[in-house]
């Protein structure tokens, strides 16, 4: 699947190739994974201890308000304000 336009902000820091981390962790296979568990990437404590799983409800909230869902996380992204953009990014993440 092609990345939606809203994913442009994500790819500034995230790769979609397995094992290829950028400033942020690779998003390959992220859907369904427990937050903060990707091997080979140093997550912030708040992220690693969040206990979240990247499913549709969690991603919907997180992509709209990252700091509200995981206070103190290192991601310098304010969130997607358009629900259609959030849905498009989640659909893309499911395909990775």
Swiss-Prot record:
Keywords attached to this entry: Electron transport, Heme, Iron, Metal-binding, Photosynthesis, Transport
Residue spans crossing the bilayer: none
Entry's Gene Ontology BP terms: photosynthesis
GO molecular function: electron transfer activity; heme binding; metal ion binding
Amino-acid positions noted as binding heme c in the UniProt annotation, renumbered to this chain: 10, 13-14, 75
UniProt record similarity statement: Belongs to the cytochrome c family.
Protein's name in the database: Cytochrome c2 iso-2
Species of the source: Magnetospirillum fulvum (Rhodospirillum fulvum)
Organismal lineage: Bacteria, Pseudomonadati, Pseudomonadota, Alphaproteobacteria, Rhodospirillales
């Amino acid at each position: 699947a092609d990345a939606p336009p809203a994913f442009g902000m994500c790819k500034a820091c995230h790769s979609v190739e397995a094992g290829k981390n950028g400033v942020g962790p690779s998003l390959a296979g992220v859907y369904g994974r427990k937050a903060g568990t990707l091997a080979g990437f140093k997550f912030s404590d708040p992220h690693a201890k969040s206990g979240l799983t990247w499913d549709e409800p969690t991603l919907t909230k997180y992509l709209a308000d990252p700091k509200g869902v995981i206070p103190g996380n290192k991601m310098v992204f304010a969130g997607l304000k358009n629900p259609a953009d959030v849905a498009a990014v989640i659909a893309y993440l499911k395909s990775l």
